[in-house]
């Protein structure tokens, strides 16, 4: 059986920009992407902690060290600058792969700096 499991999470990032007139996507600082192993063009699920919106888009690599989290195109209607978001990817794994799977979680501060890295196993709680 194949199951869809969380693979990476950027936890409590702050939206730094919103660009309605761009084609689409979310732009994320390349350092953050590297830390959680998210690739450009990879599909992401996004949760806006401020208004409860949930949506999907794809990733564009942003300037390294910028802290940039920019929602582009139609998705920009679902956020405001300074909103807190959670950005996640998922992987499809078989039962054997699940046993060793440990998602990478980057916990962010208000400046979009990584303050903690967690290699999450089941029943891990991040506040």
Curated annotation (Swiss-Prot):
| Cofactor names | pyruvate
Does Iron-sulfur show up as a keyword for this record?
no
> What pathway annotation does it carry?
Cofactor biosynthesis; (R)-pantothenate biosynthesis; beta-alanine from L-aspartate: step 1/1
Per its UniProt entry, which superkingdom is the organism in?
A: Bacteria
Q: Which residues carry this modification: Pyruvic acid (Ser)?
A: 25
Q: Which of this chain's residues are annotated to bind substrate?
A: 57, 73-75
Q: Which GO terms describe its biological process?
A: alanine biosynthetic process; pantothenate biosynthetic process
Q: Which reaction does it catalyse?
A: L-aspartate + H(+) = beta-alanine + CO2
Q: Which UniProt keywords apply?
A: Autocatalytic cleavage, Cytoplasm, Decarboxylase, Lyase, Pantothenate biosynthesis, Pyruvate, Schiff base, Zymogen
| Name of the protein described by the UniProt record | Aspartate 1-decarboxylase
Source organism (scientific name): Staphylococcus carnosus (strain TM300)
Q: Which gene encodes it?
A: panD
């Amino acid at each position: 059986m194949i199951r869809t499991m969380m693979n990476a999470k950027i936890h409590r990032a702050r939206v730094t920009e919103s660009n309605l007139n761009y084609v689409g996507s979310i732009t994320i600082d390349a350092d953050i992407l590297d830390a959680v192993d998210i690739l450009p063009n990879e599909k992401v699920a996004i949760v806006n902690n401020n208004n409860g919106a949930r949506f999907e888009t794809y990733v564009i690599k942003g300037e390294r060290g910028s802290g940039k989290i920019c929602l582009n195109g139609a998705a920009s209607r679902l956020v405001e600058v300074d909103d807190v978001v959670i950005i996640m990817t998922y992987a499809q794994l078989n039962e054997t792969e699940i046993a060793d799977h440990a998602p990478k979680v980057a916990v962010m501060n208000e400046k979009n700096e990584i303050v903690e890295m967690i290699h999450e196993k089941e029943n891990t709680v991040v506040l």
